[in-house]
Amino acid sequence: MYLFHLCLVFACVPCPTFQASKLCLGWLWGMDIDPYKEFGSSYQLLNFLPLDFFPDLNALVDTATALYEEELTGREHCSPHHTAIRQALVCWDELTKLIAWMSSNITSEQVRTIIVNHVNDTWGLKVRQSLWFHLSCLTFGQHTVQEFLVSFVVWIRTPAPYRPPNAPILSTLPEHTVIRRGGARASRSPRRRTPSPRRRRSQSPRRRRSQSPSANC
């Protein structure tokens, strides 16, 4: 249903249903829906990342297929991240079908170029962001991705003279967290190995009992 309204809006068909389509899609676009809220993130945090930060859609799709093909094509529910990846892939598949339909039905080359560029710059970018976010959460962990986004936002909003020259890297964050956990565990181990003073006191009465028969003789 929404694809029909999208076709009317993009093709700019001069018919009475055009205004109705704009109203229908306006209700949908006007809702404050942020699909990253349930994962502890937001659209605003992801928008701080530059456009060239996100890989190409073909690379993201190949990565998702190579790593999680069984989980994505299976019937069982694995995690909310797998479900989000499924929805992103289905959405992009429908958009590509829409572009192919408009390319074959719109005669103006200029209009087709404008539509394709608009789809790639808007919805294509959202699909890239969604696939990158959920694939990163499955690879590095959701908490690690949250820490990376917050640290990147702090880094990029800090003036250049007062920040490190290089931006935070997502792949280095899990190593630091492992080192911190190991250090905390290592500091507790010496306390457990120290002998308690009660054991030394318990040995003294035994020595006195062993000496008592020799004293009687």
UniProtKB/Swiss-Prot annotation:
Its main location: secreted. Residues 189-217 form a propeptide. InterPro entries: Hepatitis_B_virus_capsid_N (IPR013195), Hepatitis_core (IPR002006), Viral_capsid_core_dom_sf_HBV (IPR036459). Residues 180-217 are annotated as: Disordered. Residues 188-210 have a biased composition (Basic residues). Residues 26-28 are annotated as: HBEAG. GO terms for cellular component: extracellular region; host cell; host cell cytoplasm; host cell nucleus; T=4 icosahedral viral capsid. GO terms for molecular function: DNA binding; RNA binding; structural molecule activity. SUPFAM superfamilies: Hepatitis B viral capsid (hbcag). Residues 189-211 are annotated as: 3 X 8 AA repeats of S-P-R-R-R-R-S-Q. Sequence repeats lie at residues 189-195, 196-203, 204-211. The keyword Signal applies. Residues 1-19 form the signal peptide. Pfam families: Hep_core_N (PF08290), Hepatitis_core (PF00906). Homodimerizes. May regulate immune response to the intracellular capsid in acting as a T-cell tolerogen, by having an immunoregulatory effect which prevents destruction of infected cells by cytotoxic T-cells. This immune regulation may predispose to chronicity during perinatal infections and prevent severe liver injury during adult infections. This is External core antigen. The lineage of its organism: Viruses, Riboviria, Pararnavirae, Artverviricota, Revtraviricetes.
